[in-house]
Amino acid sequence: MVLSQQRTGSWHIYLINVIARSDSDETISFIVLGIASSGEALLGMTEGGHMKLDAALPPSGLKDVPAIAKAAEEIGFDALWTQETLHDPFLPCALIAEHTTHLNFGTAVAVSFARSPANIAYTAWDLAAQSNGRFILGLGTQVRAHIERRFGQPWPESPVKKLREQIEVIRAFWDCWQNGTKLNYRGEYYKITLMSPFFQPSPLTSPPAPLLKKRGALIPIYIAGVNTGLAKLAGELCEGFHVHPFHSPRYLKEVMLPAIEEGAKKTNRKREDVSVSVTAFVATTPEEMNFARAQISFYASTPSYRPVMDLHGWSGVAEKLSAHASKGEWAEMPMLITDEMLSEFCLVTKEDKLASELKKRYDGIADRLTLYTPFVPRERDEWWRKTIQPFNA
């Protein structure tokens, strides 16, 4: 479903939200940023604790990736994220690695249940090697309908448990390849015991970043989730967690961060050991406010996102939005998002104050920030530079 179309110079930007629902407590939604032409920082916070500003790669085709990646690096983004929507998420990463020198990059996210752990492990290994350690592996479960009916794979009884095993198997492959450890993983979903020299890649030669080395990790793994189940898993096992754009700072502080911390305690870790990567709505013009209001109304209509609305006492509004959505009454929905709601889910500010207000809003919450606004080279380049500069100071 296309919610909006914006024109920026010579580009048309289509913002599409694809949401699927399941009976589990985890629902993943992807933002499709479709673009058509008309004419040591891997973990987020460094040892010094700086918040990083990243960009999302619009899925406009592989031929556009080198130019976008070079521009993102030149302007000063810390990382560039790919998505699995219109295109494969890993192929652009190979081009980003080839055409940049210091830009971090990764998947946000690749659908894990559509692939075997071996597929993921080999691809991530090659990207880490090609980029001298700049690749971040981001995984998400997707939902039952897409896994079964689009990817043709079985849906697990416990998505969280299967993702846990996938991560453990991926790391077992990496440990085998790097350290010669015998491959012998036996779980409920996977039994992986075979690795012969003919199929074993060479060890990585680039040393891991200090924070990764301290944690015994070779390649950082982030996972994405909407509710608390996967947030707990991220806290327990992963280097990072991708936060959905439909959130409020209060929801993150009171619900998601405690869940990450709860998971971290199981493995004697702290919340600070997990990089929290947040995609944020921002609006500096009336047009951007209207756009954000429309997007937020659509997210708020989704039953799986109800806890976000419930926390703020807006359950009744969420029910009305769901009723409108079920009837396809999209035009009526944005009017139900009050200014108070908008300010909770979107940073509304003046353009010259955006960077400082972002840092204030997400201080103590986010280690990485990606704006919902798509990055398009040669369109608003100076605006991006001014926004990024305080994050890189």
List where the protein language model places each region.
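General helical structural elements
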Residues: S10-W11, D25, H87, N119
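Intrinsically disordered, low-complexity segments enriched in polar/charged small residues
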Residues: S10-H12, E26, W155, T205
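A cross-taxon signal for low-complexity, glycine/charged-rich
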Residues: Q5-Q6, S22, E26-I28, G34, ...
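Acidic low-complexity segments
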Residues: N17-A20
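N-terminal, intrinsically disordered charge-dense segments
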Residues: M1-I13
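Active-site-adjacent structural elements that line small-molecule/cofactor binding pockets in enzymes
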Residues: E47-A393
